[in-house]
Amino acid sequence: MDPRFINTIPSLRYDDDKCDDEYAFVKALCMSGGDGANSYSANSRLQKKVLSMAKPVLVRNTEEMMMNLDFPTYIKVAELGCSSGQNSFLAIFEIINTINVLCQHVNKNSPEIDCCLNDLPENDFNTTFKFVPFFNKELMITNKSSCFVYGAPGSFYSRLFSRNSLHLIHSSYALHWLSKVPEKLENNKGNLYITSSSPQSAYKAYLNQFQKDFTMFLRLRSEEIVSNGRMVLTFIGRNTLNDPLYRDCCHFWTLLSNSLRDLVFEGLVSESKLDAFNMPFYDPNVQELKEVIQKEGSFEINELESHGFDLGHYYEEDDFEAGRNEANGIRAVSEPMLIAHFGEEIIDTLFDKYAYHVTQHANCRNKTTVSLVVSLTKK
């Protein structure tokens, strides 16, 4: 391809012009592809559990969307941050099933449904699309219906769809990923993310980047979704309101930071390399989420819920199993970025260290995670 043409392609992230080589690893942000032992597809039990938790909100908003739009004959649904594997279809299945059951109940014909699966271009769409025939077969058995499935590669911090074309948007455990690493983290060296030892400036930098990104997300989706269309969004969140720096010793990025420090001590990773790595991630609390939505102004909040649940480690047979399962889950969501920055040769050792650190903290066996679920209506 002519490089002159490549240089004219619009940016996939709205602020890519500010993403320099210092944080080049952010461009590798995607889940581990394929269906092997270390893949996202094989290590996404938590994400499946979260989808099940949010199901009542999704069903309720799908029904209300259909009734408020007077049962349209065509529906376009988008799954943003779909990743790879079977989980990509769980929410879509619930949406289609809800629509068909409701239409039967009120004696209406079911609409034709387009389902758009979105993630960054680096995502393993091939593994996901292999499940499309099985998905449509299950729909036919359950609902005597099918849908049309499309891929929509690109950043959800950019425009993805034509104006007023979407009726329902769903996203689960994707919007806590930021478009870039925040600026002004020089005083947070040795930490991948916010910890209790971080300066207040690190928290403010992360919060500002989240506010900027989520505002942009809402603004872009408001152009793409029809009036009275719905969004159901689920985030990794936190409960703490008074201490914005609080992340306990079992927070997944704290454990990963400690594991990388072990490799620095052993001479496998340079300290400067560790200092140059920061996660493009933010876990908001309810108030922070609400403030961005209200300030941006395009959507009404229908529901905003906080759910805490354990990760299931307490029921695992031994500490080693708990440590290995959590290490595999974090590896599945961070490995491509870690390889891009640190190299592939340290990855197995790094997550052996991670699993060990989980076993050293009794609290990790009883660890809980917080999920925020918000449903929105386009004004």
From Swiss-Prot:
Expressed in flowers and at lower levels in leaves and stems. Hardly detected in roots and siliques. Expressed in the sepals and the leaf trichomes and hydathodes. Its EC number is 2.1.1.273, 2.1.1.274. The keyword ATP-binding does not apply. GO terms for molecular function: 2-phytyl-1,4-naphthoquinone methyltransferase activity; metal ion binding; S-adenosyl-L-methionine:benzoic acid carboxyl methyl transferase activity; S-adenosylmethionine-dependent methyltransferase activity. It comes from the Eukaryota. InterPro entries: MeTrfase_7 (IPR005299), MeTrfase_capping (IPR042086), SAM-dependent_MTases_sf (IPR029063). Gene3D superfamilies: Methyltransferase, alpha-helical capping domain, Vaccinia Virus protein VP39. Binds 1 Mg(2+) ion per subunit. It catalyses: benzoate + S-adenosyl-L-methionine = methyl benzoate + S-adenosyl-L-homocysteine; salicylate + S-adenosyl-L-methionine = methyl salicylate + S-adenosyl-L-homocysteine. Methyltransferase involved in the biosynthesis of methylsalicylate in response to stresses. Utilizes salicylic acid (SA) more efficiently than benzoic acid (BA). Can also use anthranilic acid and m-hydroxybenzoic acid as substrate. This is Salicylate/benzoate carboxyl methyltransferase.
